[in-house]
Amino acid sequence: MGDPERPEAARPEKGEQLCSETEENVVRSNEEPLLRKSSRRFVIFPIQYPDIWRMYKQAQASFWTAEEVDLSKDLPHWNKLKSDEKYFISHILAFFAASDGIVNENLVERFSQEVQVPEARCFYGFQILIENVHSEMYSLLIDTYIRDPKKREFLFNAIETMPYVKKKADWALRWIADRKSTFGERVVAFAAVEGIFFSGSFAAIFWLKKRGLMPGLTFSNELISRDEGLHCDFACLMFQYLVNKPSEDRVREIIADAVQIEQEFLTEALPVGLIGMNCVLMKQYIEFVADRLLGELGFSKIFQAENPFDFMENISLEGKTNFFEKRVSEYQRFAVMAETTDNVFTLDADF
């Protein structure tokens, strides 16, 4: 379900296939304003897509670094955790540490090369930067909690050492490698990666916050979940600009496939029961997140699921929570979010 590969019997000869695919991709690109080549792609102003530009400025205003996260109080908590809880957290961090690199590979290899709109390229460039911060943060968390070098190496190589992490990674990597899928299909697929594949794990870490555990881990989780929410919102915005969108059935197929993989990951392969969460409710939460994503993409819900976790009500994956707004207000001092017309030069400042 949701496999972007076509049946073997439907494939033409290799040379013919490459030619027809190239021609087809050129036609697709010329039909899509976002993908149409133009010398305008080298110059940002004047802004042609103000809503895309606003999202770039929001991403810029929410920038943070791994050094801002205080992990000094986490180790005493870590040492008091049960072995099941340590197992769950370390394996979730291993998944996350690998995932941000995969997201960046897609941005570098595909999206940044395909999209010709400078406003969107600015966003992707900044997303690559912040995904590197996320990857550094997860690696730092593993490095802090796991003292055994062999265990640490096992976690850092999760794509090779953990079959259930490999399954999620392979799904995402397949979309990067696929040359036959449309840009719209891949936008949906990576919205699913950041909006569905990450959602249950974010919720599990917020569950630890509800219990008053691991303040450094849970704070970094707040920062990263808000970033990923903004990235998911951006994918939905890009999707709305597409002329040739994939069909609703195709979108629902991709989303349902991601839901199935994520549910299996957190209820069978790495069950949230290890930290005291309810697996049935986690399945429901993943369905709720998927329905919300479908709505943002402009389609009807599949699951009609309610949010079963009250502690997630105030945790938005849309980049609009109190912390984000606090960051925006701080950066306002440096005019990061100001309109260019707001920048007035004066000589009457107090020194």
From Swiss-Prot:
One of its GO terms (biological process) is 2'-deoxyribonucleotide biosynthetic process. Residues 1-16 have a biased composition (Basic and acidic residues). It is found in: Cytoplasm; Nucleus. Gene3D superfamilies: Ribonucleotide Reductase, subunit A. Fe cation 1 binds at residues 100, 131, 134. InterPro entries: Ferritin-like_SF, RNR-like, RNR_small, RNR_small_AS, RNR_small_fam. It catalyses: a 2'-deoxyribonucleoside 5'-diphosphate + [thioredoxin]-disulfide + H2O = a ribonucleoside 5'-diphosphate + [thioredoxin]-dithiol. The keyword Disulfide bond does not apply. Binds 2 iron ions per subunit. Its cofactor is Fe cation. Keywords: Cytoplasm, Deoxyribonucleotide synthesis, DNA damage, DNA repair, Iron, Metal-binding, Nucleus, Oxidoreductase. It comes from the Eukaryota. It holds the Pfam family Ribonuc_red_sm. Its EC number is 1.17.4.1. Transmembrane segments: none annotated. Fe cation 2 binds at residues 131, 194, 228, 231. GO terms for cellular component: cytosol; mitochondrion; nucleoplasm; ribonucleoside-diphosphate reductase complex. Residues 1-24 are annotated as: Disordered. Plays a pivotal role in cell survival by repairing damaged DNA in a p53/TP53-dependent manner. Supplies deoxyribonucleotides for DNA repair in cells arrested at G1 or G2. Contains an iron-tyrosyl free radical center required for catalysis. Forms an active ribonucleotide reductase (RNR) complex with RRM1 which is expressed both in resting and proliferating cells in response to DNA damage. Heterotetramer with large (RRM1) subunit. Interacts with p53/TP53. Interacts with RRM1 in response to DNA damage. This is Ribonucleoside-diphosphate reductase subunit M2 B. The gene is Rrm2b.
